């Protein structure tokens, strides 16, 4: 068996096209285009790349993208004041603050200051809590994107044993909640987990998000399992690899996300979907 690649680039383009059609219909109906505010503090090169891709994606689908590039010397008070301003801006449907933030700024304070109905990253405790209670509104982008990928490939989740490796607030924890909602029996593994291999070997679906190259040996993957690799790591050679040993895993899996071109593009596609949802549901007068 050789696994079928799950093509995140293709699916993300489909999602963007669907959103672009909805934007066009809104504008033709005399309604304003959705607006996204993207806030970058400091000059972290990786953050600049991510922010650039998000801004381009917005413009492609017809959103109004407002950019706020702040110096690394920006204080927490100044950043919170900007968020207050954006919360009150009737033409902004989503507020995205690129993480990580410089030392001296508490990311929790910042994320909690964003109005839950403009929290298009899905990080606000209110939105995570809604997901936990099975009534999601704005959902965390990477886990939402993964669910979209699995859905578009008609991969049945109900009744499957899913193992999530990694327990971060951005991916692992909300991913666990998404999989519970989808009907999986879900195990979350983290740095204190004993016998990681034993857990992975039992999984019908493995989602790995630890940020360590080739962390999960391909031979651990059960025959016919689905592998979702969230990691993106650059080796000294310059090659990009995931958190799973791809070539070996592909011999056992039924479906696998490649790196690059798997999960990555779906994160931005989900951000676009969330902004559209916020605009239609929360900021359009019925």
Curated annotation (Swiss-Prot):
Q: What is its EC number?
A: 1.5.1.5, 3.5.4.9
Q: Does the keyword Aminoacyl-tRNA synthetase apply?
A: no
Pathway where it operates: One-carbon metabolism; tetrahydrofolate interconversion
Name the residues that bind NADP(+).
166-168, 232
Keyword Hydrolase set for record: yes
Q: Report disulfide bridges, numbered on this chain.
A: none
Task: Cite the GO molecular-function annotations of the record.
Answer: methenyltetrahydrofolate cyclohydrolase activity; methylenetetrahydrofolate dehydrogenase (NADP+) activity
**Quaternary assembly:** Homodimer.
The protein's name in its UniProt record:
Bifunctional protein FolD
Organism (species): Vibrio campbellii (strain ATCC BAA-1116)
Q: What does the record give as the organism's lineage?
A: Bacteria, Pseudomonadati, Pseudomonadota, Gammaproteobacteria, Vibrionales
Gene symbol here is folD
């Amino acid at each position: 068996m050789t696994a079928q690649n799950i093509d995140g680039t293709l699916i993300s383009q489909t999602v963007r096209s669907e959103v672009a059609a909805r934007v066009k219909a809104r504008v033709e109906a005399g309604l304003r285009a959705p607006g996204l505010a993207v806030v970058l503090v400091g000059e972290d090169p990786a953050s600049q790349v991510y922010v650039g891709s998000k801004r381009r994606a917005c413009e492609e689908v017809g959103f109004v993208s407002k950019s706020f590039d702040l110096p690394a010397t920006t204080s927490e008070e100044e950043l919170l004041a900007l968020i207050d301003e954006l919360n009150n801006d009737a033409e902004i449907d989503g507020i995205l603050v690129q993480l990580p933030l410089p030392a001296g700024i508490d990311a929790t304070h910042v994320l909690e200051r964003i109005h839950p109905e403009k929290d298009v990253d899905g990080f606000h405790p209110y939105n995570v809590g809604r997901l936990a209670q099975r009534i999601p509104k704005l959902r965390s982008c990477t886990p939402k994107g993964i669910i979209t990928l699995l859905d578009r490939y008609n991969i049945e989740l109900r009744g499957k044993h899913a193992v999530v490796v990694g327990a971060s607030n951005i991916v692992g924890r909300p991913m666990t909640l998404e999989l519970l909602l989808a009907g999986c029996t879900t195990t979350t593994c983290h740095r204190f987990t004993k016998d990681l291999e034993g857990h992975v070997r039992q999984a019908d679906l493995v989602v790995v998000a630890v940020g360590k190259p080739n962390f999960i040996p391909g031979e651990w993957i059960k025959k016919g399992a689905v592998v979702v690799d969230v990691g993106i790591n650059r080796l000294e050679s310059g090659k990009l690899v995931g958190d799973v040993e791809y070539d070996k895993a592909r011999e056992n899996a039924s479906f696998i996300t490649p790196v690059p071109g798997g999960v990555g593009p779906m994160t931005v596609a989900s951000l676009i979907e969330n902004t559209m949802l916020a605009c239609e549901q929360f900021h359009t007068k019925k």
